[in-house]
Amino acid sequence: MKYFPFYIDLKKKLVLLIGGGEVAERKLDLLIKAKANVTIISPKTTSYILDIAEKNNIKIINEEYSSQHLDKKYSFVIAATNNEELNKSIAVDANKNNILVNVVDRPEICDFIFPSILERGDI
């Protein structure tokens, strides 16, 4: 078994989300439901992310990612950009800093993965 299943309480945990497009939107929705304290780094973000960020007190850093953005204060980082090389670089930087990393759709370079979630109405 490569991955160890566990649930984590993200309330007040600092999470770094790198990316500002549709993939980042989906991850952001999950993080908000879990009450995580999210910081987003992206030179551009969708209007959806801007709206959600404003409503949920999420910090957006409108810059290109650099390794200087990584800080051990983050519980984990999610690389959700559309740039494969950048995502790999984020994974390498996170590993150097002993920060858990998820690179969307690249499980071979992730420390953890997000399982599929099936939501149903009230039973």
Question: Where are the model-predicted features located?
Answer:
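Hydrophobic beta-strand scaffold residues
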Residues: 38, 60, 100-101
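Short alpha-helices
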Residues: 116-123
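Short acidic/histidine-rich motifs immediately flanking catalytic phosphotransfer sites
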Residues: 56-57, 72-76
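A generic structural signal for well-ordered alpha-helical segments
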Residues: 53, 58, 90-94
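Glycine-rich phosphate/adenylate-binding loop
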Residues: 2, 7, 72, 101-110, ...
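Hydrophobic, well-ordered beta-alpha structural blocks that scaffold small-molecule cofactor pockets
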Residues: 1-53
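Conserved SAM/SAH-binding loop
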Residues: 63-67
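ADP-ribose/adenylate-binding Rossmann-like module
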Residues: 76-81, 87-112
